[in-house]
Amino acid sequence: MLPEQSLTTPLPATATAAPARRAAVLGVGAALPAHREPSTETERRLGLPPGWIARRTGIRERPLVGPDEATSDLAVRAGAAALAQAELSPERIGLLLLATSTPDHLLPPTAPVVAHRLGLKHAGAVDLAGACSGFLYALALADGYVRLQRTCVLVIGANVLSRRTNPDDPKTSALFADGAGAVVLGPSEGSRGIVACWLGADGSCWDDLYIPAGGSRRPLTPERVARGEHLMYMKDGRALFRRAATGMAEAGRRVLQQAGLDLDDVAWWIPHQANHRLIEEARRQLGMPEARTVNLVDRIGNSSAATIPLALALEAHRFAPGDLLLLTAVGAGLLSAAVLIQW
């Protein structure tokens, strides 16, 4: 369990009380598939020169699910780990938010399945489709629910992107991976918890990265599947790179301004783990020192909404109580988000 400071006991749903001051992180969890595909193997499969992927992305291996694994399996593992660290029984959770772009099925949503398997008998559950920014959008919504309802919320980011990438396209198959991370938030009257959130969207470039078919605009047909339209398509990688790097830096500045803080107050910056070059460009624009940047994309790849909760869980040993964490992400849509958390 993470260090506790003035955490309040969740009240029954019928009780009335003033909103809690903060939504604090009580526990974190991670789930990665056992199989890792080295970038050298991906290069051989795609006919790329040795070292091509590592030089351009910083990714040296990607966790990939087996044939019998799905998003819900990873989400359940990560959620169970977060609950265990928080030392909370499943009955204490009032809401589950699952940030994913790869639900088990188009219908129904996957969150209720995850809630059932985790034994969350008193929780609402819903999916959030915010692409790479989805986990931060979910944190922002969870923050309000925790404080208003004075209950605990389980937030999970989980994806199986290997099933949505074109295996013959290096722009996507060399980047995207599978994984899940989870955070338990609970009401607190102390200083720990979510300090500020900032959310943004620019739909003018919605098709920078998208899956052409499978929705109401272009339903799936055998012909569209044969053309690979059910897989991810990146229209212009360079344009997306520029927008994402600038967007992450801008989101970080906006949330700091909103909180009345500056970069010197931040102990750790945890960006969406898109690829090493994008993180470095966003870091340069933001002005964050490398020594205070969390970057583990080399071993987890890009699992979209899962990368930030994975970083929180896998690197938690580096964070000290009271540290201010800056989380930033930009995702397809184009969605951007930033969250400040006092650890």
Swiss-Prot record:
Pathway: Cofactor biosynthesis; biotin biosynthesis
Gene Ontology MF terms in the entry: 3-oxoacyl-[acyl-carrier-protein] synthase activity
Pfam families attached to this UniProt entry: ACP_syn_III, ACP_syn_III_C
A GO biological-process term: fatty acid biosynthetic process
Domain of life assignment: Bacteria
EC id: 2.3.1.-
Keyword line: Acyltransferase, Biotin biosynthesis, Transferase
Entry keyword Acyltransferase: yes
Catalytic activities: malonyl-[ACP] + an acyl-CoA + H(+) = a 3-oxoacyl-[ACP] + CO2 + CoA; glutaryl-CoA + malonyl-[ACP] + H(+) = 3-oxo-6-carboxyhexanoyl-[ACP] + CO2 + CoA
Enzyme class, spelled out: transferase
InterPro entries reported in the protein's UniProt record: ACP_syn_III_C (IPR013747), ACP_syn_III_N (IPR013751), BioZ (IPR046403), Thiolase-like (IPR016039)
Region entry ACP-binding, spans: 273-277
Catalytic machinery residues: C132, H272, N302
The protein's role, per its UniProt record: Involved in the formation of the biotin precursor pimeloyl-ACP. Catalyzes the condensation of glutaryl-CoA, an intermediate in lysine degradation, with malonyl-ACP to produce 3-oxopimeloyl-ACP.
Protein family per UniProt: Belongs to the thiolase-like superfamily. BioZ family.
Name the UniProt record assigns to this protein: 3-oxopimeloyl-[acyl-carrier-protein] synthase
